[in-house]
Amino acid sequence: MPQLDTSTWFITIVSMLLSLFILMQLKFIKFSSFSTPCPTTMEKTKHLTPWEMKWTKTYLPHSLPLP
């Protein structure tokens, strides 16, 4: 029974890793990133909702005072 020839495995694995590294670098180079991130000021928008105009309280039946 012949043995498996593993003499070329090292160069195959190294070349595969190198090519994957190069491909990933080429993929990442397409992404644009900001060089200096600056904060943006967000303006608050006021939404008019009916429950903000008056104070309401919800009474549950079990919280009513006893007679």
From Swiss-Prot:
Location of the protein in the cell: Mitochondrion membrane
GO molecular function, one term: proton transmembrane transporter activity
InterPro entries xrefs: ATP8_mammal (IPR039017), ATP8_metazoa (IPR001421)
Residues recorded with modification N6-succinyllysine: K54
Transmembrane segments: 8-24
Entry keyword set: Acetylation, ATP synthesis, CF(0), Hydrogen ion transport, Ion transport, Membrane, Mitochondrion, Transmembrane, Transmembrane helix, Transport
UniProt similarity note: Belongs to the ATPase protein 8 family.
Name by which UniProt lists this protein: ATP synthase F(0) complex subunit 8
Originating gene: MT-ATP8
